Curated annotation (Swiss-Prot):
GO molecular function: metal ion binding; protein transporter activity; unfolded protein binding
GO CC term, one of those recorded: mitochondrial intermembrane space protein transporter complex
Family stated for the protein in its record: Belongs to the small Tim family.
Protein name: Mitochondrial import inner membrane translocase subunit TIM9
Organism: Candida albicans (strain SC5314 / ATCC MYA-2876) (Yeast)
PANTHER family documented for this protein: MITOCHONDRIAL IMPORT INNER MEMBRANE TRANSLOCASE SUBUNIT TIM9B (PTHR13172)
Sequence motif Twin CX3C motif, location on chain: 35-59
Alphabetical list of SUPFAM superfamilies matching this protein: Tim10-like (SSF144122)
Encoding gene per record: TIM9
Keywords assigned by UniProt, alphabetized: Chaperone, Disulfide bond, Membrane, Metal-binding, Mitochondrion, Mitochondrion inner membrane, Protein transport, Translocation, Transport, Zinc
Record remark on domains: The twin CX3C motif contains 4 conserved Cys residues that form 2 disulfide bonds in the mitochondrial intermembrane space. However, during the transit of TIM9 from cytoplasm into mitochondrion, the Cys residues probably coordinate zinc, thereby preventing folding and allowing its transfer across mitochondrial outer membrane.
Function: Mitochondrial intermembrane chaperone that participates in the import and insertion of multi-pass transmembrane proteins into the mitochondrial inner membrane. Also required for the transfer of beta-barrel precursors from the TOM complex to the sorting and assembly machinery (SAM complex) of the outer membrane. Acts as a chaperone-like protein that protects the hydrophobic precursors from aggregation and guide them through the mitochondrial intermembrane space.
Length: 87
């Protein structure tokens, strides 16, 4: 990053932010799709049943915790690779 001029740093930052937003939207989309498919079964009403609401809450919590754990493992592996240096 230090080798980039100010304009290049700004462009790089914008690319990183766009990538982060895309990743967040993919995570959100996957969460909605998975939890809806697993939890919503009754289409006779325009509102969720208490069972469906509870299922969605548990499903989304589990999904987000799993995603957080995966992210932590990637960070740990990246730190380990950085310590080892180039091969």
């Amino acid at each position: 990053m230090d080798q980039l001029n100010v304009k290049e740093q700004q462009e790089f930052q914008q690319i990183v932010e766009q990538k982060q937003m895309k990743d967040f939207m993919n995570l959100y989309s996957n969460l909605v799709s998975r939890c809806f498919d697993d939890c919503v079964n009754d289409f006779t009403s325009n509102s969720l049943t208490s069972k469906e609401t509870s299922c969605i809450a548990k499903c989304s919590e589990k999904f987000l915790k799993h995603s957080e754990r995966v992210g932590q493992r990637f960070q740990e592996q990246n730190a380990l690779l950085m310590q080892q240096g180039p091969k």
